Structure formats: C-alpha cells, structure tokens
Amino acid sequence: MDKLLVLTQLADLLNRQKLRWAVGGSLMLYLRGVVSDFEDIDLFVTLEDAQQVIELLDQVAIPQETVPSEQFQTVVYKKYLMDGVFIDVMAGLRLL
C-alpha cells in the first residue's frame, strides 16, 4: 500500500481519538521536501497518550519485534507493520 495512504489512515485514527502525535525521521524530511522518499513512519506520541495509541495500533496493525538500544532509552518504543508500511511508535524519547 502507498506509504502516504497509510499515514493518512493513521492520522485519521489518532485524530478521531484526539491523541497528540507528530512524525519524525525520514518522513518529516520528506514532508518538508528535503528528501525524495521515506522508509517508514516514525510516530512520536506523548507519554500520556502512549497506551491508547498502542491499543489502537494493536487492532489495526501487526506488532513487530523490537530490539533494545543502549544509545536510546526511550520510555515507550513499539514497532508495527500496517499494510506493508513499518511504523515506529515512540514516547518519552531519551538519548544517552
């Protein structure tokens, strides 16, 4: 499926629930015209909304295995596959 269509579906899902979110990574650069394509959807949510976002994505996407990183100590990090597009969900981003 088209990556932008997945983003649109994801945005609609989150906005209907009035959840706070933003995109980052290569998608943000793509939307700003800096790069010509993006790999996945890096989704940043608030710690307060993280559990609800996870519950929503558990219903519409396939959870993927995540590998912990010593460099990033993000409080919430989940990975999903939705219609062929990978989505990384992050809340409480921490860099060491």
Q: Where would I find each of the regions flagged by the language model?
A:
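Helical scaffold of the NTase/Pol beta-like nucleotidyltransferase catalytic core
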Residues: M1-A22, D49
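Short amphipathic alpha-helical segments and helix-helix/interface helices
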Residues: L7-A11, I54, Y77
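Short, flexible active-site-adjacent loop segments at beta-strand->alpha-helix junctions, enriched
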Residues: L27, D49, L93-L95
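Short amphipathic alpha-helices in soluble, non-transmembrane regions
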Residues: V53-V60
